[in-house]
Amino acid sequence: MNIQESIKKRVYEKVVNEIDWENQFSDVKKSCIPPDALVKDLQAVLDRAALPSNKRGKLPMNKAIVHKNSVPQTEEGEVDVKAFIDDITTFPNKLISQNGKMEKTSKGNAWVVNTGIPALRGIVYDEDGGKFYTVNTCPGAGGCALVCYARQGSYVMFDHTSMNLTRRLNLLMNHPEVFEQIIYLELKRFCVEKNKKGVKVLMRWNDAGDFFTKKYWEIARSVTEKLLREGHDFMSYAYTKMGDFMGDLSADIVMNFSREANKQQLSKVDLDNTKASTIVPRDLFRDLFTSTGGGHFKKASDGKPEFNDATGREELKKRLAKEYKVPLSSVIYQEDLPSEEQAPNTFNVIVLPSGDSDEAAQREDVMLIFLLIH
């Protein structure tokens, strides 16, 4: 019996399945979905998938992503709500994974893994209340919602990816204590396995989604502190648009605040003294790289975009320093970060549209991360 199966057996013996809206999740922004509205939404997923790709348009930001293969149907061709409930409330195969960017970051003496939940919106079924809800999983999102990477690419192309994120969210909200125990045990296993080989384990929270509720943040903090107390060579880091979690210095989590957060969250943060990331629009750099058409750039053997000429690298640094009002001497490419961390907030780091790792987000000597939009 694996970890998930063992814990699942114990939880059903001990607890009532219900979302604690009154206490643990009182801060969650949600809306109830009537059964007929859910059926309509799921049928719309099937109808949309039947259209040519150039006719589908973008999915509204207030709708959760559901893959067409995740919409079960009866023999009569109608949406099978019961089967959908069973599917999204099934325990996820795992809470921790490793995407392509984390693989690039895992080198030498570091092993980087990540976890996430649906971006912007997710569907949750209250197992005790018997109701569906749309949950706002990124309540601090501002301009980043328009270009959210976690609502495109593999996150929407593959049904197992989007379904696993949805299952994580449902486990988190229906059984938060179980969620915490599973993710702790998964991380501990990695720590034991990797640490004995001299490899440090790094965990990125919010690969997709955000700390949409204080409870989720508390789980991340609790798991991190427990692993550190046990003496594991481990660290946690995260991107967030939630200003309330940037000032908690006891959390042992390296936080990166997104400057594309909404005004309410921006007002809670001193941007001049906060480690942060910002999305750099294409207009600021597209002419510096070799285009292959269709908005794509020619890539070198390392996967990074090629500059048109030798002056491009320095020109990009100058443009960023001027646009974001930071000293030119502080602007460096991620590949030029020294192997040993320097004093906090020393560098402002360029992360290219492709080929770069997530190292800048993990280091406290990096103040501002320039994320060149994909």
State the predicted function of each range.
Residues 2-374:
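Class I S-adenosyl-L-methionine
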